[in-house]
Curated annotation (Swiss-Prot):
Cofactor(s), by name: Zn(2+)
Cofactor: record remark: Binds 1 zinc ion per subunit.
Binding site for Zn(2+): 305, 309, 320
Prodomain residues: 20-178
Protein name: Neutral protease 2 homolog AN7962
Taxonomic superkingdom: Eukaryota
Subcellular location: Secreted
EC number(s) per entry: 3.4.24.39
UniProt record similarity statement: Belongs to the peptidase M35 family.
GO biological process: proteolysis
Native species: Emericella nidulans (strain FGSC A4 / ATCC 38163 / CBS 112.46 / NRRL 194 / M139) (Aspergillus nidulans)
Amino acid sequence: MKFIAPIALLGMFQAASASPVDIKTSNAGLQVTLSQINNTRIKAVVQNTGSEEVTFMHMNFFKDASPVKKVSIFRNNDEVEFQGIKYRVQTDDLSDEVLTSLAPGASFEDEFDIAATSDLSSGGPVTIRSEGIVPLVTEKSVTGSLSYSSNELTIDVDGAEAAKIETVGAQLSKLSKRTRVSSCSGTRATALQTALRNAASLASRAASAASQGGSTFTTFFKSDSSSTRNAVAARLRAVASESSSTSSGSTTYYCTDVYGYCSSNVLAYTLPAYNIIANCDIYYTYLPALTGTCYAQDQATTTLHEFTHAPGVYSPGTDDLGYGYDAATRLSASQALNNADSYALYANAVYLGC
């Protein structure tokens, strides 16, 4: 991991969660209906299919204006690389702008272009779908989770038209040609260096624990098979290794929001296609260096979370399928292996003996 302290041209490509006994799981759900508007432009209609009003955080979900992963795209059964951003968000003190409330049967629409976050210039048929879990919110804190799923939509992409859509990579290239940023120094540099040391320690401990398996392991990863233990341990060892060096490695880590993707409640983000990680302001002002509370957020596990997104650390990089204890522990075994917060929460649980 290359720690950017001072940062040159931009061309290089607490909150405590509720305890398990306090968290509620909704039996309701959200149904997502995907349809094609024009070529790679997609419309999603999200409907509350339950019998009660729900309030949820729509970050990393439909309605989020950032270039996040709203759908998975497949060509010949192989997933097309996602080139947008993945981030970790705070789970308490949430601002109104990141919350959506839906009465029973109510819905909202979101339109987005899948060519903005994936290279579809080769054209041809692709299939898209979406499923996962969004955080339920009560009094501006995550208190549960809500599942969602979509139909499967197959479209025929005009590659020439798709190539005209400006991608996240093209936006980064423009920034690199015109922008310089100030150095990363002082308290932020110190905080990030501490977070990296702590992340390395947490990941190393968690890797050792994962190799042995046990009840805490199966709580998060649903299986105690040797293949699951080995996969989790290998990723965590890779994170520990990446966190241990500030002069080498596969990722570039900025201590400020050099690309402008931080928004309300975002702690840090990763551009996995470029193995770039950046912290947001509230990473430093909102999070403790290392929490003493089970399943709470801190700087160390946020950094660990982001490292799991980067395929340069361990391939393939993880997605954000469920935030927080409740959502993460509702995932299937295969989903948990691909969920960033599962690793962060497990590392926290091992460290604190939760």
